[in-house]
Curated annotation (Swiss-Prot):
Effect noted on mutating residue 482 to Y: In CDC16-264; G2/M cell cycle arrest at 36 degrees Celsius
Outcome of mutating residue 530 to P: In CDC16-183; G2/M cell cycle arrest at 37 degrees Celsius
Presence of the UniProt keyword Protease in the record: no
Compositional bias per record (Acidic residues), positions renumbered to this chain: 829-840
Effect of residue 59 to A: Abolishes phosphorylation
Similarity annotation: Belongs to the APC6/CDC16 family.
Protein name listed in UniProt: Anaphase-promoting complex subunit CDC16
Taxonomic superkingdom: Eukaryota
Pathway(s) served: Protein modification; protein ubiquitination
Length: 840
């Protein structure tokens, strides 16, 4: 059922045919009077905007339901008089979400609203009909109008106009005149024929599927034909503003303000100036008539304009240094006593469902303090903004993204928020807020919230849910998994600024220089004035060890966005790598002041002082970092190293064991895990717990066999425990992996010298091996002797034969004399031969 734009008769579209129904003039007049929509003017004498209202209070879509309902019970004269009263545009008895329901930015769809395409209900009938659902007062009908900018969200007869316009465009020769009813029938037939022709051209041979869009004009909807000229101009202005046609919006808004002289109309004209970057004109408009003193919306807009003009002191003068709407303690006590006394007249202020202006002003105050580098007051203002209205998510995000709160303070603030204001949406909103908190603590709770959002609310592919997983992986040094998650998001949103910093960090950690180069090149072409662009370029040069170029672009990135923490830390790192300690300390100190809730600048300050051998100063900064984030393995590792250098090995072991406990779920091949294991092994070595130290090193060696330092450390421990062969093997392996390892070279030299000079036990493997080798040598020598005796030398043989002949002759002479020592003489001769042979 539709209402004709030019008459109050209604018609029903059935299969492309328009069936017309007549209404009596009396019924028509009653329809006009009962469905009259009254534009709200909160600046009327009966009510003005308060800090509990939002800009919805000045929206042209706000209606007065109760006033329209009470008009039916009034006499005609009294009813007309009431319509003329300016204060009739306001009624505080309506639902606090009434204006929100009527806003074009809100979509309220019932589950039983029919979809645009459904099969015909009666296939036997020549005209297939679809029964439409009747929409209640607070419900909106889904619209698939191609001519409507707002689609299914528009809650007024602006949708009716667009629907009729679409219908008029779809047929030829359709003319509607309230004076000629027959034209409607003819045009209905023409519409049916046109639809049939169009379907035949498209090749549809089956039954036609049509859609019946039924709207009922109620007191909560806008009927353009029932609005006054000024109200229609306001709708025109609003629609032009929503479509970013600022010249049209400015032209109409200026006329509306001149006609009405209403501060709300001045506010919307100022909005047009503000959105068109004409901030000076917005300031002149509001200050010329002192509108900031009578309209809180104009005051807020004036403060925004001053901020855009970087006139922060003027902006602070407009909105105040403190929240003027904060309750006085005495007033709060009085209200508490009256509530305890069951005072029925005491009630909470009724809001319109939008973000309260009080919260918006607190947020703007925080932005001003943040721009002035007054971070403590900025933190307090942002915290007050989110506590005043939990719907002000931007204030909550500023506290987290700008590192104004420590991880524990973030969770404390989250626990203090009252999510009951969201009603039935409490669960989803609580989880959506939780996934933005710090990942250094309560990681299990955040992981559980991610699972709930993915399973119960089908948000597994949502950017913020994936970003939460990215932050968890990056914090736990799971760079490969983090890189995969980042790439899934960047496939659909290539330049997502929330994902790019972690993605760039993963590329650097994994030494993926090619992807880092391509990303930096695309960013430089697309966003040459973005801080993330030059951060990526600087990180690429850092991966190439071109420190001077990296320093240049880190500086440029920090200038473009002074609140970009990663750029500040990278800029300070370049000075530290170049050995410029003073400049590095200055840069780290600046980052520590800019980001009071971040522990990394304090950690790096401690590392710089430790490199300068100022262990007491290093300890003080490490303690500050530990107080902010006690579960960061980097902090615990550096504290262990610091106490190791102070020869306090018991304390060093305490912090390193705690760090090892924290990184048990981290990637075992990450540099963080390896460093902690190595440092803990050296600590055990200093405490003469060599076996535990060896186990510690071998545990890492199972995960990373290509680390030269691990082999060097194991070689030293085996050398200390007199296991020379294992020591020499590991030291050789260390030098194979890193030939310029001076420690391994020195240790190997000592091991080889010790292997020569050290007296070993009889049971030592080297002794057993030596005995086996010596026995084999003797056997070989004996065999060689036997072989050498078989060699033929004529000269020697002649001498030996001559000698033997002489001996033989002497023996014969002795035998002739009857001597009895022939045997003995023979034996002595054999001994002398053997002796000669041995000497040879």
């Amino acid at each position: 059922m539709k209402f004709c734009l030019y008459c109050c008769h209604c018609y029903i579209v059935i299969c492309g045919k328009a069936t017309h129904y007549y209404k009596s003039s009396k019924a028509t007049s009653n329809l006009k009077s009962s469905n009259r929509v009254l534009m709200r003017n909160p600046m009327s004498p009966s009510e003005q905007h308060s800090q509990h209202n939002s800009t919805l209070a000045a929206s042209p879509f706000v209606s007065n339901v109760s006033a329209a309902r009470t008009q039916q019970s009034l006499p005609t004269d009294a009813q007309n008089d009431r319509l003329q009263q300016p204060w009739n545009r306001t009624n505080t008895a309506t639902s606090p979400y009434q204006s929100l329901a009527n806003s074009p930015l809100i979509q309220k769809l019932q589950a039983n609203i029919m979809t645009p395409h459904q099969p015909s209900a009666n296939s036997n009938s020549n005209s297939n009909s679809i029964t439409g659902n009747v929409v209640n007062d607070n419900n909106l009908l889904a619209s698939m109008s191609k001519n409507s900018m707002f689609g299914s969200t528009i809650p007024s007869t602006l949708r009716k106009v667009s629907l009729q316009r679409e219908y008029k465009d779809s047929v030829d020769g359709v003319v509607r005149d309230e004076d000629n009813d027959e034209d409607v029938h003819n045009n209905g037939d023409a519409a049916a024929n046109a639809n049939n022709d169009r379907e035949s051209k498209l090749g549809h041979n089956g039954p036609l599927t049509t859609t019946t869009l039924t709207t009922t004009t109620t007191a909560t909807q806008l009927d353009v034909s029932e609005l006054s000229a000024i109200e229609r101009l306001r709708l025109w202005r609003f629609d032009a503003l929503m479509q970013h046609m600022y010249r049209t919006a400015e032209y109409i808004a200026d006329k509306v303000y001149n006609i009405s002289n209403d501060p709300d109309d001045a506010f919307w004209l100022g909005q047009v100036y503000y959105n068109n970057n004409q901030y000076v004109r917005a300031v002149e408009l509001i200050t010329r008539n002192n509108l900031d003193g009578v309209n809180i919306l104009c005051r807020y807009l004036l403060g925004l304009s001053f901020v855009k003009l970087q006139r922060f002191d003027d902006a602070l003068d407009v909105i105040g240094e403190y929240n003027p709407f904060s309750e006085d303690p005495s007033t709060t006590a009085a209200n508490t006593m009256s509530n305890n006394g069951n005072n029925s007249n005491t009630s909470q202020p009724v809001t319109d469902g939008g973000i309260k202006m009080e919260s918006s002003l607190c947020f703007l105050r925080g932005k001003i303090y943040f721009a002035q580098n007054n971070f403590n007051k900025a933190r307090d203002a942002f915290r007050e903004a989110i506590l005043v209205d939990i719907k002000n998510f931007e204030a909550f995000e500023m506290l987290l993204s700008k590192n104004l709160l420590t991880p524990q303070e973030e969770w404390d603030l989250f626990d203090s928020l009252d999510f009951k204001e969201f009603g039935e949406d409490k669960e989803i909103m609580k989880n959506l807020y939780k996934i933005n908190l710090s990942k250094y603590i309560n990681t299990e709770d955040i992981t559980k919230s991610n699972e709930i959002l993915a399973k119960d609310y089908k948000l597994a592919d949502n950017v913020d849910v994936v970003r939460s997983k990215v932050d968890i992986c990056y914090t736990q040094c799971k760079f490969n998994e983090c890189l995969e998650l980042c790439e899934t998001v960047l496939e659909n949103d290539e330049f997502n600024t929330n994902i790019l910093p972690a993605y760039i960090g993963c590329l650097y950690e994994l030494s993926n220089k090619n992807k880092l180069f391509l990303l930096s090149h695309r960013l430089a072409e697309t966003f040459p004035k973005s801080a993330i662009t030059w951060f990526s370029v600087a990180t690429y040069y850092m991966s190439l060890d071109r420190i001077s170029e990296a320093q240049k672009y880190y500086s440029k990135s920090s200038i473009l966005d002074p609140s970009f923490a990663a750029a500040w830390l990278g800029f300070a790192h370049t000075y530290a790598l170049e050995g410029e300690q003073d400049q590095a300390l200055t840069a780290y100190s600046t980052a520590s002041r800019f980001f009071p809730g971040m522990h990394l600048p304090k950690l790096f300050l401690g590392m710089q002082f430790m490199a300068m051998n100022s262990l007491n100063l290093a300890e003080s900064y490490f303690v500050l970092a530990y107080d902010i984030c006690p579960n960061d393995p980097l902090v615990l590792n550096e504290m262990g190293v610091m106490y190791f250098k102070k020869n306090e090995f018991v304390k060093a072991k305490k912090y390193l064991k705690k760090a090892l406990e924290v990184v048990k779920d981290l990637d075992p091949s990450s540099r963080t895990t390896i460093s902690i294991q190595l440092n803990l092994g050296h600590t055990y070595r200093k405490l003469n717990e060599n076996e535990i130290a060896i186990k510690c090193f071998r545990c890492v060696l199972e995960k990373n066999d290509k680390n030269s330092e691990i082999h060097c450390s194991l070689g030293y421990l085996y050398l200390k425990t007199k296991k020379l062969q294992k020591a020499i093997d590991h030291l050789h392996k260390s030098l194979y992996l890193k030939p310029n390892n001076s420690s391994a070279t020195a240790l190997l030299k000592n091991a080889l010298e010790l292997n020569v000079t050290l007296s070993l036990d009889a049971s030592h493997p080297l002794i057993d091996k030596s005995n086996l080798m010596s026995q084999a040598s003797k056997d070989k020598a004996s065999l060689n002797k036997k072989r050498s005796s078989l060699t033929y030398d004529p000269v020697n043989m002649a001498k030996r034969l001559r000698t033997q002949k002489e001996i033989f002759d002497q023996n014969n002479k002795a035998l002739r004399k009857g001597g009895h020592d022939s045997k003995t003489g023979s034996n002595n001769a054999d001994d002398d031969f053997d002796a000669d042979m041995e000497l040879e």
